[in-house]
Regions:
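C-terminal, non-catalytic "cap/extension" segments appended to globular domains
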Residues: 1-123
Length: 123
């Protein structure tokens, strides 16, 4: 339970998850979850390749020749190599990790922690 409730009365037969195609279509959602984790790992890896110094959320790979070349090189592998090799070519490891996502959102988490200090959740 997340402590969130509807702003209006809801009938017992309401089925909001059905509005997302993947639910009634029985489409596996794991790929989207993994893609989100990888997105942050790729971003962090490309920022490191550019020698970016600073918080991850301030790094932009837009217009970077270095980041573009590295990403292009990884994508050129296609299916010729295991996906772990492609991952390693960008981030330097073959492991999936949520650390890059945590690093990206660290300033927001710190702000939220400070903002909510001494607050008690009602649920």
């Amino acid at each position: 339970y997340q402590g969130v409730k509807s702003s209006i009365e809801r009938p017992l037969d309401a089925f909001d998850p059905g509005a997302k195609y993947h639910i009634p279509g029985n489409t596996p959602y794991t790929r989207y979850y993994l893609a989100r984790v990888l997105q942050y790992q790729f971003h962090e890896g490309l920022c490191k390749a550019m020698d970016f110094q600073g918080p991850l959320h301030e790094c932009s790979i837009y217009g970077s020749q270095i980041a573009g070349d590295q990403l292009r090189s990884m994508l050129a592998l296609g299916q010729s190599r295991p996906w772990q090799d492609a991952l390693e070519s960008i981030i330097g490891t073959r492991e999936l990790s949520g650390t890059a996502m945590l690093n990206y959102y660290a300033p927001l988490k710190e702000w939220l922690d400070n903002k909510n200090k001494d607050r008690v959740c009602g649920w």
